[in-house]
Amino acid sequence: MMEGLDDGPDFLSEEDRGLKAINVDLQSDAALQVDISDALSERDRVKFTVHTKSSLPNFKQNEFSVVRQHEEFIWLHDSFVENEDYAGYIIPPAPPRPDFDASREKLQKLGEGEGSMTKEEFTKMKQELEAEYLAIFKKTVAMHEVFLCRVAAHPILRKDLNFHVFLEYNQDLSVRGKNKKEKLEDFFKNMVKSADGVIVSGVKDVDDFFEHERTFLLEYHNRVKDASAKSDRMTRSHKSAADDYNRIGSSLYALGTQDSTDICKFFLKVSELFDKTRKIEARVSADEDLKLSDLLKYYLRESQAAKDLLYRRSRSLVDYENANKALDKARAKNKDVLQAETSQQLCCQKFEKISESAKQELIDFKTRRVAAFRKNLVELAELELKHAKGNLQLLQNCLAVLNGDT
């Protein structure tokens, strides 16, 4: 009856919903290519098949695959953070833990309420919830793949022994999740780090570049955090509107099937309009979630990683200044001068090493995020225009049918 929009699924196609959905403008390198070729959900666990192609001499084979779980990704991330050799680099943020509880709860509630709805309504809602679950699953896989690709693209981190073990060792890494005691220890470490961060933040940086970056990143992180929360609200609003269209369309359809009068035919035609409009609105929500919300969430975590880098450098600067003071005291007292000089030299070398790599890391971070935001925002704008035109076409076709023009 109404043309201008196909009757495809409510969620994005396989191509759009694929593992490349979260775009961070990664630079590919033929020497080491990593992707997640498959994933399997087993209750509360997801098993990722990590596929690697490499021409590097460090690996025994040119192509291989291993199965990894989320805890092993966290282990790899933590090993980077805890390694002093990587203090001058932005450590790619760890992927978030897979969370399907909300989708499972919706499916459970749907099953409990099956008796209160028609077979068609139940089938439609079941398909939508299953598609929603699949979308979350694909997003989870994508975020884990992005982490690996960021590491593989990094000229230093890609050489890490733990990373090679993660990619190549075809047995279980025997990594477990942290227990309550370890989580409590992490909590206190973060408290100490926060308090220490207040102390080092009051130290005037000797380099204007880093002073500017510290001020900028603090503001940038807060703005991205605020934008992420607002983007989520916007996405939920579109999803809520789609749900409302569904309920209105179902009610009109029920009215339209009561009789064969003209008013009932009118109800059926308008019901079809709401059904197709619902599909567009659901796609709008999905597009905004993929192209904007996911990107903001990723760069919220990566900007925190950049802030952590600046904290490590500031901490190193404070240690260097304290070492200088200790050396002056040792010389004044003519006691333990050699030990103080050695400590001062080590602190100086560490600070200079971190500063050298940190500057390039922050420059690359800016280039990467600007390219990613430009690409995703342009694509989102094009999709919004496409959906707006689709809505307009639907309304025009519906009016033409109701007016008897077609």
From Swiss-Prot:
> In terms of one coarse class, where is the protein primarily found?
membrane
Q: Name one Pfam family in it.
A: PX
| Residue ranges annotated for the PX domain, each copy included | 26-173
Membrane topology listed for this record:
Peripheral membrane protein
SUPFAM superfamilies associated with the record = BAR/IMD domain-like, PX domain
Residue positions annotated to bind a 1,2-diacyl-sn-glycero-3-phospho-(1D-myo-inositol-4,5-bisphosphate) are 41-47, 100-106, 114-117
Locate the BAR domain: which residues?
203-406
Q: Report the record's Gene Ontology biological process terms.
A: cellular response to amyloid-beta; cellular response to epidermal growth factor stimulus; intracellular protein transport; negative regulation of DNA-templated transcription; negative regulation of neuron apoptotic process; negative regulation of transforming growth factor beta receptor signaling pathway; regulation of postsynaptic membrane neurotransmitter receptor levels; retrograde transport, endosome to Golgi
Modification type N-acetylmethionine: residues? 1-2
| Region described as Interaction with PIM1 | 2-179
Which UniProt key words apply to this protein? Answer: Acetylation, Cytoplasm, Cytoplasmic vesicle, Endosome, Lipid-binding, Membrane, Nucleus, Phosphoprotein, Protein transport, Transport
| InterPro entries in the cross-refs | AH/BAR_dom_sf, BAR_SNX6, PX_dom, PX_dom_sf, PX_SNX6, SNX5/SNX6/SNX32, Vps5_C
This protein's GO CC annotations: cytosol; early endosome membrane; glutamatergic synapse; lysosome; nucleus; postsynaptic early endosome; retromer complex; tubular endosome
CDD domains assigned to the protein according to its UniProt record, in alphabetical order: BAR_SNX6, PX_SNX6
Domain characteristics, as noted in the entry? The PX domain mediates interaction with membranes enriched in phosphatidylinositol 3,4-bisphosphate and/or phosphatidylinositol 4,5-bisphosphate. The BAR domain is able to sense membrane curvature upon dimerization. Membrane remodeling seems to implicate insertion of an amphipathic helix (AH) in the membrane.
| Family label | Belongs to the sorting nexin family.
Q: How does it assemble?
A: Forms heterodimers with BAR domain-containing sorting nexins SNX1 and SNX2. The heterodimers are proposed to self-assemble into helical arrays on the membrane to stabilize and expand local membrane curvature underlying endosomal tubule formation.
What protein does this entry describe?
Sorting nexin-6
Q: Which organism is it from?
A: Mus musculus
Q: Which gene encodes it?
A: Snx6
